[in-house]
C-alpha cells in the first residue's frame, strides 16, 4: 500500500513538472522568436544582415519542424531552418550538447604516483616492524640475531 502511494506521488510530481516545463518552453520560444524577429518593416530590414532578410516565420505545416528550437523559413532555400535553444544543436535541434571536462593528465599521474608511494611505504614499515619484533624475541645472550655474534 505504501509503495503504491509512493509511486502515485512520484507520477503526479513528474506530470506536474512536465506540464510546467512545456509551459516554460513555449513561453521561452515565443520570447525568443519575438526578440529574433522584432519588426517586419523595410527600415528594420535595411539594418539587418542579409541572412535575416531571407528568413520568415514558418508555415503552419512546418510548425513542429524544430524539436528544441525556433523555426524560420528561408525564402531562397525554400525550406525551414532552425535556430536552436542553448544546449542543443543539429539540423532540427535534435542533439543535446553535453558538457565535457578534460582532466589534466599530469594530475592523474601525480595522484597515482603518490598512491603507489604511500602503499610501498606502508608495506615496508610493516615488514620492518615484523622483522624487528622477531629479532627481539629471538635475542638472548647466547643466540645470534641478524648476523651479530653473542658475547
UniProtKB/Swiss-Prot annotation:
PROSITE patterns in the record, alphabetically?
Answer: EGF_1, EGF_2, EGF_3
The region annotated as signal peptide is 1-18
User: Is the keyword Glycoprotein in the record?
Assistant: yes
Q: Where in the cell is it found?
A: Membrane
Is-annotated flag, keyword Signal? yes
Q: Which residues cross the membrane?
A: 109-129
Topology check: give the Extracellular ranges.
Answer: 19-108
Q: What is this protein called?
A: Epigen
Name its species: Gallus gallus
Show the taxonomic lineage: Eukaryota, Metazoa, Chordata, Craniata, Vertebrata
As recorded in Swiss-Prot or TrEMBL, the protein's gene is named: EPGN
Amino acid at each position: 500500500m505504501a509503495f503504491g502511494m509512493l509511486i502515485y506521488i512520484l507520477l503526479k510530481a513528474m506530470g506536474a513538472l512536465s506540464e510546467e516545463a512545456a509551459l516554460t518552453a513555449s513561453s521561452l520560444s515565443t520570447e525568443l522568436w519575438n526578440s529574433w524577429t522584432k519588426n517586419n518593416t523595410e527600415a528594420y530590414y535595411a539594418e539587418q544582415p542579409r541572412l535575416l532578410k531571407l528568413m520568415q516565420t514558418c508555415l503552419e505545416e512546418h510548425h513542429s519542424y524544430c524539436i528544441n528550437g525556433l523555426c524560420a523559413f528561408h525564402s531562397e532555400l525554400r525550406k525551414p531552418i532552425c535556430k536552436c535553444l542553448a544546449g542543443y544543436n543539429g539540423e532540427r535541434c535534435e542533439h543535446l550538447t553535453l558538457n565535457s571536462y578534460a582532466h589534466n593528465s599530469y594530475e592523474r599521474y601525480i595522484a597515482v604516483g603518490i598512491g603507489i608511494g604511500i602503499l610501498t611505504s606502508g608495506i615496508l614499515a610493516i615488514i620492518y616492524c615484523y622483522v624487528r619484533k622477531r629479532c627481539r624475541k629471538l635475542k638472548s645472550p647466547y643466540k645470534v640475531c641478524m648476523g651479530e655474534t653473542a658475547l
